[in-house]
Every structure is written in C-alpha cells, then in structure tokens.
Amino acid sequence: MKKWQCVVCGLIYDEAKGWPEEGIEAGTRWEDVPEDWLCPDCGVGKLDFEMIEIG
C-alpha cells in the first residue's frame, strides 16, 4: 500500500486506511479513487497529489 500527499496542503491519503469519511474504504488503491474526488482539506483534485515514502 502506498501513501499520497497533497502538494497544496500536505494532507496524506494512505491506501491502507482509505478515507471512510469520504466514502473510500480501507485498502482502496489510489488509482481506484474516483477521478472527481477532491482533497477534503483544500479542494484540489487527484492530479495535485504525489506518491511519497514515509519512514
């Protein structure tokens, strides 16, 4: 599972955790997140997220 970070506000989407508040179940891969999904903190789209490594 990977993590993706919003380049605008820094929010991190963790594929292992998903985003249940937004209707995205745990284990949902980034490519399976709907294309029209927006960052819940700043409102940008998926194109403004970059894959990151944490650790």
UniProtKB/Swiss-Prot annotation:
Family statement drawn from the similarity comment of this UniProt entry: Belongs to the rubredoxin family.
GO molecular function, one term: iron ion binding
Description of what induces expression: Constitutively expressed.
One GO BP annotation of this record: alkane catabolic process
Domain Rubredoxin-like intervals: 1-54
Major localization class: cytoplasm
One GO cellular component term noted in the UniProt record for this chain: cytoplasm
Pathways per UniProt: Hydrocarbon metabolism; alkane degradation
Cofactor remark: Binds 1 Fe(3+) ion per subunit.
Role description: Involved in the hydrocarbon hydroxylating system, which transfers electrons from NADH to rubredoxin reductase and then through rubredoxin to alkane 1 monooxygenase.
Name of the protein: Rubredoxin-1
Compartments it resides in: Cytoplasm
Organism of origin: Pseudomonas aeruginosa (strain ATCC 15692 / DSM 22644 / CIP 104116 / JCM 14847 / LMG 12228 / 1C / PRS 101 / PAO1)
Annotated positions binding Fe cation: C6, C9, C39, C42
Superkingdom of this protein's organism: Bacteria
Cofactor(s), names only, from the UniProt record: Fe(3+)
Keywords: Cytoplasm, Electron transport, Iron, Metal-binding, Transport
